Structure formats: C-alpha cells, structure tokens
Amino acid sequence: MAEERPPRLVDYFVVAGLAGNGAPIPEETWVPEPSGPLRPPRPAEPITDVAVIARALGEEVPQGYTCIQASAGGHPLELSAGLLGGTQPVICYRRGRDKPPLVELGVLYEGKERPKPGFQVLDTTPYSHSANLAPPGPGHPRTYLTYRRAAEGAGLHALGITDLCLVLPSKGEGTPHTYCRLPRNLNPGMWGPAVYLCYKVGLAKANTLVYEAELLGRYPEEDNEAFPLPESVPVFCLPMGATIECWPAQTKYPVPVFSTFVLTGAAGDKVYGAALQFYEAFPRARLSERQARALGLLSAVERGRALGGRAVRSRRAIAVLSRWPAFPAFRAFLTFLYRYSVSGPHRLPLEAHISHFIHNVPFPSPQRPRILVQMSPYDNLLLCQPVSSPLPLSGASFLQLLQSLGPELAITLLLAVLTEHKLLVHSLRPDLLTSVCEALVSMIFPLHWQCPYIPLCPLVLADVLSAPVPFIVGIHSSYFDLHDPPADVICVDLDTNTLFQTEEKKLLSPRTLPRRPYKVLLATLTNLYQQLDQTYTGPEEEASLEFLLTDYEAVCGRRARLEREVQGAFLRFMACLLKGYRVFLRPLTQAPSEGARDVDNLFFLQGFLKSRERSSHKLYSQLLHTQMFSQFIEECSFGSARHAALEFFDSCVEKVHPEQEKPEPTPLVELEELSGSELTVFITPPEEPALPEGSESTPQYCYDGFPELRAELFESLQEQPGALPVPGPSRSAPSSPAPRRTKQEMKVAQRMAQKSAAVPELWARCLLGHCYGLWFLCLPAYVRSAPSRVQALHTAYHVLRQMESGKVVLPDEVCYRVLMQLCSHYGQPVLSVRVMLEMRQAGIVPNTITYGYYNKAVLESKWPSGTPGGRLRWAKLRNVVLGAAQFRQPLRERQQQQQQQQQQQQQQQQEQVSAHQEAGSSQAEPYLERPSPTRPLQRQTTWAGRSLRDPASPPGRLVKSGSLGSARGAQPTVEAGVAHMIEALGVLEPRGSPVPWHDGSLSDLSLTGEEPLPGGSPGGSGSALSAQSTEALEGLSGRGPKAGGRQDEAGTPRRGLGARLQQLLTPSRHSPASRIPPPELPPDLPPPARRSPMDSLLHPRERPGSTASESSASLGSEWDLSESSLSNLSLRRSSERLSDTPGSFQSPSLEILLSSCSLCRACDSLVYDEEIMAGWAPDDSNLNTTCPFCACPFVPLLSVQTLDSRPSVPSPKSAGASGSKDAPVPGGPGPVLSDRRLCLALDEPQLCNGHMGGASRRVESGAWAYLSPLVLRKELESLVENEGSEVLALPELPSAHPIIFWNLLWYFQRLRLPSILPGLVLASCDGPSHSQAPSPWLTPDPASVQVRLLWDVLTPDPNSCPPLYVLWRVHSQIPQRVVWPGPVPASLSLALLESVLRHVGLNEVHKAVGLLLETLGPPPTGLHLQRGIYREILFLTMAALGKDHVDIVAFDKKYKSAFNKLASSMGKEELRHRRAQMPTPKAIDCRKCFGAPPEC
C-alpha cells in the first residue's frame, strides 16, 4: 500500500481588490446599510497638540485650538472650582497633519511617580504659566498631563488620537464607547466632583471612496471538490472595503496590514484565511470628474482645475486559505510575496513561488515534525507539528485574550458566552480579533457555540448585529465612527480593555458562578497575567535561519506553556461546572417515540439543577436552556465527530475536585513530546531555469506593483516530482464499526498498565483484558464472515458474560463499544440493551463514545414487531412445557437405571462365553459377525481425561480401574474397564453391518467429554456403536491368558500417588514396539460413516497377540504392559483427531503447531510462556521481555510449524474430496492410544496414516516476534485504521502481516475464542480465491485445520542436554513427536528419573531438587540444562502421571517449601545461580489467568 502524502498547508491563493483591466470605476460608492443610529461625521484630521490654559490668569485659547468646556453628557465643568487661589485650568487641543499625531495620553502625580518612557510632561501653558491641574495648597499633589507622539515618518495611516472628552461619574456619566479613560482623577482635591479624561484612538483620514472588493485572481483555478473556494472570500480579505484614497504626493506607503478570518461551513467545519492589505498606485484616468472632485483632486472653486501635489492610491489584498490555523507561517509567506512584488528584477516569476509553496509545503505530521521552508536566501519560515491534544485545533490565542482583557474581564466574557449573550468584539488590529474570538468559543469547551460566529465581520455583513439571536462578531473599530452599537449588544473593546453594556441586557454577576471554582480560576488567571506581563514580548520579528534552528523552540516553548496553562484554567472551571453530569443522562431502553431526542428525555434537568449550589441556580437555569447545552447532551447521547474530545473532557471531570480551593497538581492539558524524531524537512526555493552554456543570467521579471496572475507562469502539478495530491476529506477506516481507541483511552490504558505491572494479579488481568480487546477488534470481520451474523453477535455477547464471570479487568470500553455498534449496524437493539445492562452489572459507567453508540443502536434500529402480550403468552406456554418435561425426568432416569442393570448382567454372561472361545482360537483368523443387541461389551481400562487433540474441549470423565500395577492381561479387569468407560460415555447399543478388517493395529481413542454435538451429528459421544464393536472386545478377551503374568483382583482398592509412582518406575523393561505395515483397503470397500470414539476403539483389523493398551508409559492409565503386549503393537497416526468442533474425527488437512517458548541467548536458558508474560514491560512500544534467570532483555519468538497433508497440486474434485467428512482414510483406523505419550509421537511422518496416498507431509516452519498484548493491540489498531477491518478476513493476511496474524492466532486459541484465523491459513496455502466468495475458507470444516499449542519448544537443540521428561519417554520406548537429535548424557539415567519421581511422590521435593543439583554438578563445569530445575521436575511429573493428574498449584506450594528448606543450607543466591528458583508470583498469576498450554 503506497504511503499517503500529508495534506497541504495551503489550498488556495487569492488576490482581492478593485476590478482591473483599465475599466472606469462605477460612480456609485459602496455604502453598507446602517445597522444602528448614525453618528456625526468623523473628524478629518487627528489631534497633534494638547494644551492647558489658566482662565484665572487671563489666558485665552490659542489660535487653532479647541477648548473642552462641557462634559461628555453636556454638563458644565470647571477644574479647581470654588477654591481660592485656583487658576481655573482648561484643557485644549489642536488638529492637523503638520506633525505626527498623539497616540497616548496620561496623568502624572508629581512626586509620587516618574513619567513613563517615551512620554512628555505638559508642565507649562502656552503663556509660560504652570499647567498644574490640581488646586493649590498642601496635600494636593501637582497634577500634569503627559502625552506620547507617533514616530516620525509613521505615514498617513498611523493610529492617533482623534477625539477628547471629560466625564463626571457623579452625574451618571460613563466612558463613551470606543473611548479610553485615564484612571487618574483630574480634580483630586476634597472639593469639587471627580473629573476623568477620555480619549479615542483611530484613523483620521479624508478623501476616500469605498467599494466592495472583488476577486482579481486565484490559484489554482479549479475548485477542489471537497473544499471549493467560497464566493465571499474577497470581502473577508478587505473587510472595510476596497478603497481609493487621495494622499499628499510625498506620503510614504504604510506598512501592510495583516488580518485573519474564519469561514464556517454549514456542517460546522472551519476554513482559516490570512490576508495582507497594502496600497498601490491607482491611475487617475480611471476616475470620473465626480470621483476626482470627491477625492479632492479638482478644485471646488475653479471647476475642472486639477490640484497639484496629490497622489491616488487604492487598497488591495493577497490572501491564502487553509484548513490549518498556521497564521505565523501565512504572515511570513504573504510578506515575502509583497516584498517580491515591490523589488526586483527577478529570474523567477512570482507565480512560480506561489505554486511551489502550495504544492510542496505540507502540514507537519509525526513523520515530518519540523518543516523549514526557505523562500529566498533571506526569507525563511519554520513549521512545527502542533501539540498532540484531544482539544480541537483552532486559531485561538489565550495569551492575547488574557493580555487584552485581563483576568476579571475574561471571566465576565466567559459568563456572557455561557449564557448566550450578543457579543461584539472590536479592535483596530484585525489580526487580534480572530485570535480572541477563537479563544472565546474555545474556553467553553466541551460546549460548542451554535449561534452566528464571525470573528472578522466585513461591512457587507454588518446587518448581523441586528439579528434577534445570540452571536459572537468581531469588527474593526472604525465601524463605530459611523454607527452606534445596538442597545442589546455587549461591546468589548480590545484596545482599551473596556466592556460596554446597557441596562436592557446586563450580564449576571460573577458571583453567580460556583464559588470555589470561580476563586480558583480568578487566582490562576491573575498569577498567569503577572507572568505574562513579565515574559511576553509580542509576535516575533523576522526570524533568521540561525534563530529558527536554535532559539525558536525555546521561545515558542515558553509561550506554549503559558498558553496551555491559561487554557487549562478554563478547562478546569468547565469540568467543575459540569461535574457529575453523566449521572443525570437518561439512556433509551425501549422503542423510541416522538420527541426521543429532546433534551428533557435525554437529561434529567431538574435533578442536575438541584445537585448544584443554591447561589448558582440562576446561572444554571440559563445555561441548561441554551442551544449549546442541548447540543452537548445530544452529542453525549448519540455520538458525534467530537467523541474523542468529549471523552477527554470526561477524564478531566474525574480528575477535578470542585470543593478544593487550589487547582490539582497534575495539569489537565499536558504538553506532550511532538515527536521522538528530531527530523527537520528542508524545503528549498523553486529552481531557477537552466541557462545555455556560455550565456549570462539576465533577470526577466520586474514589477511596479502586485501583478496580475498569469496561468502560464505557474508550475504545473505534473512537473513537480514531489507534488502533493489535492486534499480531500479525511478518510476513515473502511470498516463500518470504529473499534479504535481515542488518545485519551490510550493514555488511561498506559497508566493502568504501569500501575498493574507492580501488582502480579493485576498484571495478569491487564494482559488478559487486552487479549479480549484484540478479539473484539477482530469481531467485525468475524461477524461479516459468519453464516448467521445474529448468532455471531450473540456469541460475542456470551464472551462478554464470560469475561464478567472471570472478573477480567478491561482497560477501556472498546469491547462493549464494538458490540453495540455492530448491534446498530445489523439492527439488534434488544441485544444492545442487554449489553448495556451487562455493563451496569459490571459497575462500568459508559463513556461518551460507548453511550453514543448505544443510544444510536436503540434509536435507529428497527425493533421487533408484535405486542408484548403475545410474547408473554408464548413464554408462559414454554414454561409449562419445560415444567412438564422436568416432572417426567425422574421416571425416565429410573427406567434407564433398570435397563443398565439388565444389560450389565447380560454383558457379564456373554463376556465369560467369549473368553472361553477366544482362549481356544487365539491364533486363528478372526471372523466378524453381527452381534446381537444384548451382546456383552468387554472393558478396557484407560484414562479418559481431556482430549489431547482438542485443547478447547472440556475434560471428560476420568475412568479408572482398580489397583492394577502388576497385573498383566487381567481379563476381568479389562472387561470391567471397557464396560465402565462405555457407561460413562453414554454409548448406545451397537448397530451396523460387519466389515472385515485386516490390520494389526487399533485406532486412536480420543474423548471429547460430555458436550453434545451441535446439529445432532452422529460423531458425538452419544453415537451408536458399529457392528464390529463386540467382535473387537472378543479379540481383547482372547489375549488375556496369552499375555501371562500376575493377576490382581478387580476389587483391589486404588493406590495413592506414591504407589502409582512406584508402579510407574519400571518402564525400561519393555521391548520396543514392532511396526507392521498395514495392507491397503480393498478398492470396492465403501467409505465408512463417521464413527464415535468407541467405534474406533472397537474396530480390529488384525488381532494382535496381546492387548493393545499400554499403560506403564501412559500419562493417565494405571496398569503396565508386558513385553509381549508391546511386541505386536503397531503405531500409526490416528485418522480421527479432534478438531475445534466436538464430534469431528476426521484427519486434519492442515495441522498448526505453535509454541512461545523462547531461548535467552545471554544465558542459554529456555523461557516459558508465563515467564515471558511476567517479563513484559507496561509499554506498548517495547518488544522485549526480561529473562528470569539472567535479567537480560531479549525479544521472545513465537515458533510456528504447519504440516500440510493435502496433495501438492489438488484438482477441484480431489480438493473437494479431501475436505469431505466422509472421505475414507487410507490405511484404516490407527492404534488404541490410551497413553498421552503415544499421542505426542503421532507427528512423525513414518507413523502417519492420514497422508494421501503415502505422500509425505509438507512441513513449513517459522518464527516471529512474540508480542505483548499491549504491543499487539497497538499494531492491530494501526493496521485496521490504515487498511480497514476487511484486511483481517483476507487470505493474504498470514503472508502480509505474519507477526500480527500468528500472535492473534496464539492468543485466540489460548483463550478458546472462535475466529476465522485458522481458515485463513488454509486459504493462504491455496492462494487467493478468484472464482468464489471467501465464505468457504472463512468458515472451513473444523476437521480441515487443527491448531495445537505446545508448552515446550517445537524443535529441540541437538547441542543441549535433553529434558528429563523426554528421557522418560525415551526410556519408556514411547515414540516422540520429534526424535531427540543429540546424545544423552550417561548421568541422566533411568535410575535418576525414578529417584526424582519417588521423592516427588513421597512429598520430598527438596530431595528431588538436591539430587538433580548434585547430578548436574556446579556451573560452569557441570551439565547445563536449558530448562530450570523447577521446569524439569514439573514436566517429568506430568509426563509420568499425566497433565490432568497433576495439581500445578499444589506442586508450586511443595516446590516453594522445598526451595525455602534448601535456601537455609545452600543460600538463595546459590540456588538462583543454579536456576533452581520457581517462577515469580507474576508468572504464576499469568499462568493461572491464561492457563498452561495442554501439551509439551
């Protein structure tokens, strides 16, 4: 799969302004409709001077000055009024353009403070008297005005003071809108009212024509289908309109103005824009006479005479549009383009730089965390990957919000947004508006603003201010030079840090906020505001390349830390505000009705309100009825695209404590590492065109202004090898359910894993929970491939209940979430309700994502039709029928007991007759005939424990005989044993026709327990016996006298463990079994039907001279075989191996062996599965485990071996025959294998009778990394997210992703969970299927594939010492699965094995350990066993007694006691050095949770 290219940083480049092509400008100017009362015309010139005159001293107002004689409300005022000796000062000001304007005023109390830098003190009047504004006398500090002037050459468009006024608060006057009030009182004396000076800053300019902006150019020309260029972009690029202005001829061009804006789509998606506004020359020829007169170009007295010394300029803008708010990068790029257009000449056109930036600069990603773009040798910009956070990405700047408004005003605006008021934010800096408005809508997270939102509103859209709905609008402050704001709008001036509101629409008091969370928020913001005042330096200057590569991250890191702390303070407040809201959610539990999506039906409003503080009820009453809260409850109930962010907020709610008066020590918004890689991608400027040899480089492109874009000069996308495709919408995984965890869930799971790693029990349960999570990740593919999808969903539901009964600790809710979404997808709302009830019973409160999937399944799925009364009556009828059946059950059981007693009596009589007949004709060829139904069955003693062929099958009944340790051929005991076995298995009466067999071996015996076969298959434990059953028992009874030897009575009491071990300690006396090749089947023999386990047992081919059940080397039987009994034994591979489905006894076409036992190369020791699990680290990126012997890390391996018995090139007919359940097996049935050690030897090719036509089995081996469930889950989630869940059902999965596949197969088989993975192995061997649907190999015949999990290694090391349990089997002459390839040390004799077993049987484990240590000798001179002492003794005991006869828990206790006893004499360190310690508690708990693999 090709790597997807990262998305573009910029999608469009546009040019906006007045229409070009030299056409005349329309006569009508563009004036927007007034949205408020009109103000008087603004002044044409700024204030350049301010003065103070003393009326009492006879001073007059200077020429050109204006005197302030009344307050803003029209009240007459006089400074120092009524005081003797007062000078009666009056403030005057003058307008003009002869000098730079004033930009700031101040009031200075002499002696108490020093003037601010850059300010001048107005200490004298124009007539050289004192300009003190305070009354004379002691106690009154001398008060002077101070001012600051704009710098020389600031230009025509420099901001300046445009108006002054005085206010009297005692008369009820407030600060006028858009004015800034000085905090110092101009009348500080005891007499007279307080007087404050206010001033207004703005742009004072005249002779301007305003028109609506138009689109002059764009690139690319074609719209992207997923992101078309909005038509309103030009008016946002020039929000105050495209203007034509008349300037003095020598006026310098002002610095370009940078602005940002946000366009919101109908679906709520945002498009970010950045524009650079600048002026350029405009030809006079395009102006009409009327327009020229309006601009002041023609004399108003002498008609038609042009005035000299004037220049005409027009405003234009260039802009970029993107889905990413990378405003600093956009500013640098647009500034570079503007400089490029006013300089030159250049060898490359401007269009080449535009297309190069759009196509070749991607948005930073984890693979490219830092991108350094070099636009020219002197212009560079650095792009860094945003901080990974669950919070939505936006263009908000909380630092600018806090710096512009301060802590108290910021909290006041938070209250206004929460109660959905009309907010109008204005400033003279257009780039500040977007950052602050974005912060306003971001600080109410998780609530989402639902009303109109325009961070930078153009004049053409100013009528939104009169809308009757709440809104957040940002606008340029010059708008208020013409209009007053509406009465019901709250205005916020970012330049003066003031809030203007009327009495009609007044905000709630901040005291209505929750008391303690409000105090914590205010204290936190105040502290950060002080830090911001000290460290914040504003936007960075033009950055050099050296700065970008060295100090940029340090500077940005400090800003990012403060940014996240301010955002975290608001987030904590919102978490405290909504604490406990999930308790009041109302889930849907029945078929939905009208109004099911109403907030009253989804949320208990009154209950939530009563749970809050009484002082805050007024706030909550308004908040609960807002549109954004209703939308929030709907998103929590039915899910949305913001589910990851909502889940993160829920985790924040759990962390906060509203009753505390200090914030939590752990920050809610953490700064994460951007990437572990320090990779910086360097993007060079576009290449200059190649020149012919010998020619000189001549610049070709020179611009007088920003040129008109020419399509032929853009570099086409095909010419760029690294070009990025046009971005489309983000593609989700193809799978319908989304089983992916959110980033917050991954963090929580990581923390849980780290805590669980310190507690052994929790670590094992943590791994088990992740294993179940793996299965549910694969559940969508399993359900799609199932014949009955509804049944598959119910299977998953039973797995959930099994997890609950097993007290499995789940790290997240993915298991429940996947099942609920599948219920929604396949229309199973009732099952979804049952899953929700299971969650509640397990004490799990569903998070936002799970809760949304649940309600969606209940709301959108079709509920079953029918009335509840009908279902209730059917249920009652069902109960009546079941009750009647239960009453008849005792009668049926009594009849069966009587029939069994009669049959036993008849069997005993028949056995005696058969025994006499067999004694006289044991050497003759048997003749099989159909027995009568009452023919007695003979008994054979064997172990009927768990099936060695099917680890998933439950253990069957254990059938034992009496004490038969020295009995050889005990006839009555054998007969009684077979009868007891048949009674335990519930075998029916024999039926069928006699079939002559000619073979000297008996078939395999495999018991599946008491689980019935689905579908009533005749292959189960309750199937009927064939006609040959009794004849086979006759053959067994005839061999009894010939075997000879001692006989014990059948009624001898059973021996204990010590007696059984003593009985088993003579295995080496038997001679090796001779193998007799069986004759081939007659060609005319019809294929036999499927048989039960007892059918296979009772089918003789050729009567051997003695009984075929060998027990001295058995893991489960209790009697020995004589030498003669082994001499005629012919071992062949069973053709009726158990597969995944009980009752299937067909030879598997493909056998898979898996083992996780791995070798530590550091100490040459084998580490077993539970030890590997205990050594894993709680890290989803660490593949290593820790060796329990040398503590060295290493990567464990999962060994895989596949044995394929199918033909090499199967034809369609043969392929179908090989998979048929009734296909005959060449060679007939195999021998009776009542011994587990004999079962382990069936993988030898020479012992197989299940191969086709004698062909050898194809064996393929491999080893892959054995992954922790944490690591495997991360890799599987990545695979599903990138390729969809369909990849888990493709036959290419084993070859394309072998590590993931084999690890999944190992865990699923280990936990006995159904899956389609075994079928994928079979399909991958056949190759992809092109002519048929994948269902045949997704649900293969269970007999086709068999998976066996082994505890020990698959292939032994020939250079190492053999394990003791293998030596026991070698001494016992029992064929192995793999013949030991190396020599056997003489010290590891049979006597040693017998001694070890004897000590174990006598509860003297310490002696067994000491004996082994003494025999091996001290390292490094002694023998080196790859397995530890604990493992050697355990495996030897299990090989001698059988796995089901060994209580591993009791063995661990005994071994621990023996270790402590030896440690007192030898020391624990010495025992550990010689690898005699037992597994750690963590390893033992892992084995307890997962269970030991059934085979060695």
Swiss-Prot record:
Residues 195-369 form the uDENN domain. GO terms for cellular component: cytoplasmic vesicle; cytosol; Golgi apparatus; nucleoplasm. Gene3D superfamilies: 2.100.10.50, 3.40.50.11500, Tetratricopeptide repeat domain. The modification Phosphoserine is found at residues 953, 1092. SMART domains: dDENN, DENN, uDENN. Residues 1075-1090 have a biased composition (Pro residues). It holds the Pfam family uDENN. Its main location: Golgi. PPR repeats lie at residues 775-811, 812-846. InterPro entries: cDENN_dom (IPR001194), dDENN_dom (IPR005112), DENN_C (IPR043153), DENN_Domain_GEFs (IPR051696), MABP (IPR023341), Pentatricopeptide_rpt (IPR002885), TPR-like_helical_dom_sf (IPR011990), Tripartite_DENN (IPR037516). One of its GO terms (biological process) is regulation of Rab protein signal transduction. Residues 720-744, 891-970, 995-1055, 1067-1119, 1205-1227 are annotated as: Disordered. Keywords: Golgi apparatus, Guanine-nucleotide releasing factor, Phosphoprotein, Repeat. Residues 913-924, 935-944 have a biased composition (Polar residues). Residues 44-203 form the MABP domain. Residues 729-739, 896-912, 1105-1119 have a biased composition (Low complexity). Residues 528-644 form the dDENN domain. The keyword rRNA processing does not apply. Residues 390-526 form the cDENN domain. It is found in: Golgi apparatus. GO terms for molecular function: guanyl-nucleotide exchange factor activity. Guanine nucleotide exchange factor (GEF) which may activate RAB10. Promotes the exchange of GDP to GTP, converting inactive GDP-bound Rab proteins into their active GTP-bound form. This is DENN domain-containing protein 4B. It comes from Homo sapiens (Human). The lineage of its organism: Eukaryota, Metazoa, Chordata, Craniata, Vertebrata.
